[in-house]
Amino acid sequence: MVCLKTLSVFLAAFAVADARAVFKTQSNKNGEMIADNYIVVMKDGVSHDDFKAHVSSVASIHTTNKAKRGTNTAGMKREFDIMNWRGYHGHFDRDTLEEILNDSKVSYVEQDQVVRISGLTTQRSAPSWGLGRVSHRRAGSRDYVFDDSAGRGVTIYGVDTGIDIRHQDFGGRARWGTNTADRDNADRHGHGTHTASTFAGTAFGIAKNANIVAVKVLGSDGSGSTSGIIAGINYCVQDAQQRGILGKAAMNLSLGGGFSQANNDAVTRAQNAGIFVAVAAGNDNRDARAYSPASAPAVCTVASSTIQDSKSSFSNWGSIVDIYAPGSDIIAARPGGGSQSMSGTSMASPHVAGMGAYLIGMGADPRRVCDQLKQLSTPAISNPGSGTTNRLLYNGSGQ
C-alpha cells in the first residue's frame, strides 16, 4: 500500500505551529532519500508574482543562515511551473527549512529522493516480438499490422537517460530537448535510446511517424532525482505549450522511485494539460502503489508481459496498473547504431506511449487515451497478479 506518511504538524526533530505547511516523508524502503534536498510545492492559487517573491525571500534567508552558521548548503536549485502548479527544489539547512514551512503560501515540502530506470539489459540480440503481439488478438505472429498514419503529427517526449537523436532508427524525427541530470547530453546508458526506439522507431517502434524529443533526467548509471524528473516534466509541458502541441503530445517515463506526492502531482498536471503520460510500473514484483510516478491515478501505469502472455517475473502489479504490454526481451535501438535487447517495465511503458501517440494521431483526446487502450485490450495475461487487471495492449488492427 502507499507508504507516504503525513507528519501532521511536526517535523521529526521539533514541534511546529498549526499554520505550517505539511512536511511529508517516506517511511517505506523503496525511497532512497537525498540529504538536505527538498521539493517545495506552493498552494493552488498562489500567483506568479507571489511565487517569485517567496523564492526571492527564501534565497535571502538561506544566504543569511549560511553566513551565520557556516553551512555548505547550495540553496535554491530550480523552479517548477507546470500549468500553474508551482514549486522549487533546493538544498537547505534546517533553519531555512523551518522558515519555508512557516510560510502560509506553501502547501507541502517533500524530501528529494533517488529515481532509477525500470529496465534490465540482457543479451545484445534477440527476436523482436512485441510489435506483432500488440497488433494481434492471439499470440504468435511476427507481423506488425498498423494504420500507416502511425502517430504522424504527434510528439513524444522521452523522459529518460537521453536519446541518440542521430540514430538511423529515428529517421531525422528526433530532436534535443533539455538535460536536468548532468552536463553530458549524450545517452551513455542506452536506456533512453532503447525506449524511444520502442515508442517511435522506424524499424522497432509503434508510432513510426511520430516526432521524438530527448529529455534527459537520468545519468549514465541510470539514476537521477525526483526534483530532476519534475524539472524534465516542467520542460515538456512548457515546450508543448509554446509549440502549440498540447493535445497532440505524449510522454514516456520508464523510471521510478519511492512514493512521491510531488512527482505524482507533476505528472498529473502534465496529463491534465493534454499530454498522454505512460509510466513504468516498476521491477520489484511488488504493489505499484508504493512507487512514483506509477502510483499517480491520472496516468497510464504499465506492467510487463512475456512472449508467453504471462506477467514478467520482475513486474510490479496491483490495482493501480492500467494495462500490460510486452516488456521481456524487447529488441530496439542502442546508441551509436545497431540494436540490443532489454527487459523491464521500462520496455513495456514505451509500447503504451507509442500506442497513445498512434491513437492521438487518429484523433483521440490524450486525456481519454488510457481508457480507450483499456477498452481495446485483450484479456490474455495468464497470471496478472493480485488485484491486477487482465488487459494486454492491442491496437485494434482487427487481426
Curated annotation (Swiss-Prot):
Compartment annotation: Secreted
UniProt-recorded name of the protein: Subtilisin-like protease 4
PROSITE patterns hit by this protein: SUBTILASE, SUBTILASE_SER
Record-annotated Inhibitor I9 domain positions: 38-117
Record keywords, A-Z: Glycoprotein, Hydrolase, Protease, Secreted, Serine protease, Signal, Virulence, Zymogen
Compositionally biased region (Polar residues): 380-392
Lineage, broadest ranks: Eukaryota, Fungi, Dikarya, Ascomycota, Pezizomycotina
Annotated signal peptide: 1-19
Source species of the chain: Arthroderma gypseum (strain ATCC MYA-4604 / CBS 118893)
Cellular component terms per the entry's GO annotation: extracellular region
Gene: SUB4
